[in-house]
UniProtKB/Swiss-Prot annotation:
Full protein name: Phosphatidylinositol N-acetylglucosaminyltransferase subunit P
Cellular component terms (Gene Ontology): membrane
Membrane topology annotation: Multi-pass membrane protein
Highest taxon above the source species: Eukaryota
Keywords: Glycosyltransferase, GPI-anchor biosynthesis, Membrane, Transferase, Transmembrane, Transmembrane helix
Chief place of localization: membrane
């Protein structure tokens, strides 16, 4: 029986599952490549008679790639459909936008000015800073 001061040493369950999973993937990949590239006569000579058609050695990766491509196109299209038009003001302002509040609190001589509350920077201010030649320098 373990006391409270003793620790149980050994691998974590997640580490064991990760190791077994990675080894299983390597073994499955090797079996798939052997099945795909070794001639049928050799497989039959070592006693393997039942295996899927060699068509699936090319079809499975191609179906996977096409499925991935269709899912990617669908995902990008769904994102385009769910966003506002570039000319919409909803791309600049929403319910969570915070206007810049300029306030000058009463300060005694020698006191530092407090930090302004957090706010969004107006797009016109950003454009002025980025594209006006006298402000950009």
């Amino acid at each position: 029986m373990l006391s409270l001061n003793q620790e149980v040493h050994g691998p974590k369950t997640s580490e064991v599952y990760g190791f077994v999973g990675s080894i299983s993937i390597v073994v499955a990949t090797v079996i798939f490549l052997i099945w795909g590239y070794v001639p049928d006569k050799f497989l039959e000579s070592i006693g393997i008679y039942y295996y899927p058609s060699k068509y699936w050695a090319m079809a499975m990766p191609m179906y996977s790639m096409v499925t991935l491509l269709v899912a990617l196109v669908f995902y990008i299209g769904l994102n385009f459909m769910s966003t506002s038009k570039p000319t919409s003001l909803n791309t600049l302002f929403d319910d969570y936008s915070r206007e810049d509040v300029n306030f000058l609190p009463l300060m005694k001589n020698g006191e530092d000015r407090p930090i302004d509350p957090i706010s969004d920077i107006d797009i016109t201010r950003i454009n002025d800073l980025m594209f006006d030649s006298h402000l950009a320098k």
